[in-house]
Amino acid sequence: MAFKKKFTPKKKFCRFCANKNLPVDYKRPDILKDFITDRGKIIARRITGTCAKCQRRLTLEIKRARQMALLYYTATHSAEHLKKM
């Protein structure tokens, strides 16, 4: 009988702590989009691997970018959905 190896996930690290030149800023929606699902939800830190401090800052900056219309609040609608309206 063969024993299965336990799955050990790859160690996650905070991208912002590892690279100090990568700022968390609402003016950079290209970076912030990596931390948002296709539905527009902010991805949890246990999935992204960011530290608690950077996750709080990231959440705040995403909310600022949404208020300034640099990011969507929800997912973009497809053309088929808009035709039905």
From Swiss-Prot:
Q: Domain of life here?
A: Bacteria
Q: Does the keyword Oxidoreductase apply?
A: no
According to its UniProt entry, the protein's GO biological process terms are: translation
Q: Which UniProt keywords apply?
A: Ribonucleoprotein, Ribosomal protein, RNA-binding, rRNA-binding
UniProt GO molecular function: small ribosomal subunit rRNA binding; structural constituent of ribosome
A GO cellular-component term linked to this record: cytosolic small ribosomal subunit
Keyword rRNA-binding part of the UniProt annotation: yes
Matching InterPro entries: Ribosomal_bS18, Ribosomal_bS18_CS, Ribosomal_bS18_sf
Name of one Pfam family that matches: Ribosomal_S18
Record function comment = Binds as a heterodimer with protein bS6 to the central domain of the 16S rRNA, where it helps stabilize the platform of the 30S subunit.
The UniProt subunit note reads as follows: Part of the 30S ribosomal subunit. Forms a tight heterodimer with protein bS6.
Family, per the entry?
Belongs to the bacterial ribosomal protein bS18 family.
Q: Name it.
A: Small ribosomal subunit protein bS18
